[in-house]
């Protein structure tokens, strides 16, 4: 994971299902990106930091957080089954989060945004 204070991700394999939780990650550094691609390869579920929109991301460079477009690219490249965007900006309301989900689904239909109470079954 690429974050100024460090971060870690989790890859859990159970009964043939693969769950990847990638917290606090800013795309753009080739070495961590390559490691993350290997880490997320063929995951059934990928939960990915998408705090920013692609438009916001350039001015937030160095903060250690991702955006939905990077998440979609990773999911496509890694043949992920389901993408769940999380680590939403705390200033966003539910409508703004829904708008992000809709935008991401135009590129990767199996995308959703994590919400309080979300239950994931593998």
Ranges and model annotations:
Residues 13-21:
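Metallo-beta-lactamase
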Residues 18, 26-116:
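Cap/insert and terminal regions of metallo-dependent hydrolase folds
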Residues 8-12:
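Short beta-strand scaffold segments in enzyme catalytic cores
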Residues 20, 120-122:
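Extended recognition/assembly regions associated with phosphoester-bond processing machinery
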């Amino acid at each position: 994971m690429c974050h100024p204070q460090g971060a870690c991700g989790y890859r859990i394999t159970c009964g043939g299902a693969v769950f990847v939780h990638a917290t606090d990650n800013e795309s753009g550094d080739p070495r961590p990106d390559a490691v993350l691609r290997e880490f997320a390869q063929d995951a059934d579920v990928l939960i990915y930091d998408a705090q920013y929109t692609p438009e916001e991301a350039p001015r937030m460079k160095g903060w250690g957080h991702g955006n939905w477009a990077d998440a979609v690219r990773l999911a496509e490249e890694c043949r992920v089954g389901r993408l769940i965007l999380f680590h939403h900006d705390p200033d966003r309301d539910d409508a703004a989060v829904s708008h992000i989900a809709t935008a991401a689904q135009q590129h990767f239909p199996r995308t959703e945004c994590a919400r309080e109470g979300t239950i994931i079954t593998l």
